[in-house]
Amino acid sequence: MAAPQDVHVRICNQEIVKFDLEVKALIQDIRDCSGPLSELTELNTKVKEKFQQLKQRIQELEQSAREQDKESEKQLLLQEVENHKKQMLSNQTSWRKANLTCKLAIDNLEKAELLQGGDSLRQRKTTKESLAQTSSSITESLMGISRMMSQQVQQSEEAMQTLVSSSRTLLDANEEFKSMSGTIQLGRKLITKYNRRELTDKLLIFLALALFLATVLYIVKKRLFPFL
């Protein structure tokens, strides 16, 4: 049975992967965004929230790594933490580049609209719909993976709760066993003491009976054979 600490480490890793995929999906949406700026701002707000959640899980994993008893496991987890940090920095770089690309595309489209007028608006609408379809397809795929990871996280949490409940049951059973052991020891001592006392009582009865018989024989002897 896995230790609660191991289950927590596995949950952290799964959530880190989930948030990483969600960040990548949002960055792809930013790359495909052709405006307006309000849509870009909304996407950036979502990315910031996901980065905050990702950073928090990485910090939790790092704390769990430092609490490991075995040095080998500690170093292995710290290496995983370092890899996650590098991946997060890479995502942040991609995020900045995606913003630059999106803003440049918005600027170019606005300039084209001024030059081409109505034709540009129709072309922009068609381009935006095509990009939206592509983005939607990519986002659905990544979110599908994210949902799968969420289910795994939930299953791990349920396993952890079951583990904690089982641990409590074992502790209660251990306490009951200790109590029963004490009772058995006390009963054994009482039985031993009773057996000894019973033997002593039998010996005393035997001696009293022997003394009684000796007295009777002595009296009979004196009555029947006084000359002896």
From Swiss-Prot:
GO terms for biological process: apoptotic process; apoptotic process in response to mitochondrial fragmentation; endoplasmic reticulum membrane fusion; endoplasmic reticulum organization; protein transport; response to activity; response to oxygen-glucose deprivation; response to starvation. Residues 1-199 are cytoplasmic. The chain crosses the membrane at residues 200-220. It is found in: Endoplasmic reticulum membrane; Mitochondrion membrane. It comes from the Eukaryota. This is Vesicle transport protein SEC20. Residues 37-90 form a coiled coil. Residues 221-228 are lumenal. It comes from Mus musculus (Mouse).
